[in-house]
């Protein structure tokens, strides 16, 4: 019997102001853990899988139940330790310490590979936490919509003189992360064709308004794209097909998209990528019989897809890796020039990271969408001179369906995060908001990740693989008084390729919370400015100077 599978479970977080725990500082992590497993949020909630292949919220259902039980009895001077999704200890700390400290999927470097992890996983000794799955701050596909939108806008500026109208994007994957690309693309003015092998995922994205139409053949999908481009109204199409097949067929036909990328779960060749010619059912059987054969077949198909991406790049498509490590997988399968197209961070996002700008997100524990709309207005009030941000907030309200607890994400940096958090806390205090707000971020941020094939690819000083930075980030956020802190390995790009940390803090309207919020939400993005300034980026050095950071070696 698989202790991780229970189709009878239907988890929905409590809403309103009635507490199940002893304070909001423990109620918040409990609700956010539950929200990660909401049926409208998680990819496979019955298996505790939130997103990203096998990114889980808890190691098994027994561990999940025990985490909830402990949070409900935890005092405000105690800290729960969670080791790879398992609650292993409660310790006396103090009221400004984190209520939960989480470590997921971490392995000694020599053993940091999928083979060793999968053995531990089968024995019930480990859990893959992805980034926000095991750190309980996943908010559905909205979580990366704005970052993806900003990337596509940057691509239009860089490649198409700022004009995306009449252009189209080819990509793959409609899981929790990939599902953001169709909506982000149409928001940025492109049409989008996304390949997906699992029809239930296409239907999920249709239901949550991330995809406009479904197609079952390439010809049908291309006709939809052509019609949209002719009409001037962008459309997103979910095509039921294998990305490797479609990408290669487009090369064969001589059809070149304007933008090419991919967000299948290529980071996990065993669980995340369907080989060409295989059905989902056959892949599930093969995973039980011969894992090595599955991995080999998946990597062979990834090689086909990456070769097609390179060919489309040569034909004129703006081509980028969107952070799923597909280039590495293809390289290991013999595609020697797999890295000839860039990752999206060095190509489009790094200047933002240099100013500590990244995916700031917040969640209304009340469950009331009005709380989010009020915070949207507060963001506009406090940041009046950023039309791109205002445009994003307007589009998000109009086009993004909340999944689970109402939430919002917007990319803001060092100079704004603490200001916004303190304003939200004041809104809770004076009753403008009906319940506390949880504030967090993705692990994909400026100072919280070491990932040489993604966030820290091609660093100016060659420090791509130095992972001291996310470790220091987690330690500093713990010392600063975050409500929960996490340290993970392997998120986004798979085992052996990344280390990263997460932070979440509660704005409960108290004066103590204001002190913690001011510290945490200054220090956290400041570590990103520090990291990039140390690597030699002038934008980061100037930001550090302007914001008065004390960086002794600069």
Swiss-Prot record:
Example GO molecular function: urocanate hydratase activity
Function according to Swiss-Prot or TrEMBL: Catalyzes the conversion of urocanate to 4-imidazolone-5-propionate.
UniProt-annotated location(s): Cytoplasm
Lineage, uppermost ranks: Bacteria, Pseudomonadati, Pseudomonadota, Gammaproteobacteria, Alteromonadales
NCBIfam families to which the protein is assigned, alphabetical: hutU, PRK05414.1
Protein name in UniProt: Urocanate hydratase
Gene Ontology CC terms: cytoplasm
Keywords for the protein's UniProt record, in alphabetical order: Cytoplasm, Histidine metabolism, Lyase, NAD
Positions that bind NAD(+): 52-53, 130, 176-178, 196, 201, 242-243, 263-267, 273-274, 322, 492
UniProt-annotated catalytic positions: 410
The protein's required cofactors: NAD(+)
Enzyme Commission no: 4.2.1.49
Record field: catalytic activity: 4-imidazolone-5-propanoate = trans-urocanate + H2O
Pathway where this protein functions: Amino-acid degradation; L-histidine degradation into L-glutamate; N-formimidoyl-L-glutamate from L-histidine: step 2/3
Name of the gene: hutU
Entry similarity comment: Belongs to the urocanase family.
Swiss-Prot/TrEMBL GO biological process terms: L-histidine catabolic process to glutamate and formamide; L-histidine catabolic process to glutamate and formate
Entry coiled-coil feature ranges: none
Cofactor note: Binds 1 NAD(+) per subunit.
Top-level taxon of the source organism: Bacteria
Matching Pfam families: Urocanase, Urocanase_C, Urocanase_N
Enzyme kind, highest EC tier: lyase
């Amino acid at each position: 019997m698989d202790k991780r599978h229970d189709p009878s479970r239907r988890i929905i977080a409590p809403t309103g102001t009635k507490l199940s725990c002893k304070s909001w500082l423990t109620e918040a992590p409990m609700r956010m853990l539950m929200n990660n497993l909401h049926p409208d949020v998680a990819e496979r909630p019955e298996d505790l899988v939130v997103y990203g292949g096998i990114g889980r919220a808890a190691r098994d259902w027994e561990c999940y139940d025990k985490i909830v039980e402990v949070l409900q009895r935890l005092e405000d001077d105690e800290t729960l330790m969670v080791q790879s999704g398992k609650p292993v200890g409660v310790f006396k700390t103090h009221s400004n310490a984190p209520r939960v400290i989480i470590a997921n999927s971490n392995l000694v470097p020599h053993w940091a590979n999928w083979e060793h992890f999968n053995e531990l996983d089968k024995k019930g000794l480990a859990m893959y936490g992805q980034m926000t799955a095991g750190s309980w701050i996943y908010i559905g596909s909205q979580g990366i919509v704005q970052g993806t939108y900003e990337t596509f806008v940057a691509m239009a500026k860089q490649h198409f003189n700022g004009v995306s109208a009449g252009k189209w994007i080819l990509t793959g994957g409609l899981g929790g992360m990939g599902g953001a690309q169709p909506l982000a693309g149409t928001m940025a003015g492109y049409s989008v064709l996304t390949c997906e092998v699992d029809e239930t995922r296409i239907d999920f994205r249709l239901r949550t308004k991330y995809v406009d139409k479904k197609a079952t053949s390439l010809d049908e999908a291309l006709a939809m794209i052509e019609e949209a481009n002719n009409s001037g109204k962008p459309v997103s199409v979910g095509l039921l097909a294998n990305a490797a097949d479609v990408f290669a067929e487009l090369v064969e036909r001589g059809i070149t998209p304007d933008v090419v990328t991919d967000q299948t779960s290529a980071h996990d060749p065993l669980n995340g990528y369907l080989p060409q010619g295989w059905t989902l059912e056959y892949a599930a059987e093969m995973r039980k019989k011969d894992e090595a054969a599955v991995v080999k077949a998946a990597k062979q198909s990834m090689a086909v897809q990456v070769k097609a991406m390179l060919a489309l790049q040569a034909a004129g498509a703006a081509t980028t890796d969107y952070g799923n490590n597909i280039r590495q997988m293809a390289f290991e399968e013999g595609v020697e020039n797999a890295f000839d197209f860039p990752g999206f961070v060095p190509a489009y996002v790094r200047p933002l990271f240099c100013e500590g700008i990244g995916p700031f997100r917040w969640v209304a524990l009340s469950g009331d969408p009005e709380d989010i709309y009020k915070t949207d207005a507060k963001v506009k009030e406090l940041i009046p001179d950023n039309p791109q941000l205002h445009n994003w907030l307007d589009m998000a309200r109009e086009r993004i369906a909340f999944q689970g607890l109402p939430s919002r994400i917007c990319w803001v940096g060092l100079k704004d995060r603490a200001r916004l958090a303190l304003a939200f806390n004041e809104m809770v205090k004076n009753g403008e908001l009906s319940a506390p707000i949880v504030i967090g971020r993705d692990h994909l941020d400026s100072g919280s990740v070491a990932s040489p094939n993604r966030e820290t690819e091609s660093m100016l000083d060659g420090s791509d693989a130095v992972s001291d930075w996310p470790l220091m980030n987690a330690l500093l956020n713990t010392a600063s008084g975050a409500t929960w802190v996490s340290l993970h390995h392997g998120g986004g790009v798979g085992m052996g390729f990344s280390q990263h940390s997460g932070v979440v803090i509660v704005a409960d309207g108290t004066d103590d919370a204001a002190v913690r919020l001011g510290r945490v939400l200054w220090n956290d993005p400041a570590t990103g400015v520090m990291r990039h300034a140390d690597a030699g980026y002038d934008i980061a050095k100037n930001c550090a100077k302007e914001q008065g950071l004390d960086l002794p070696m600069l």
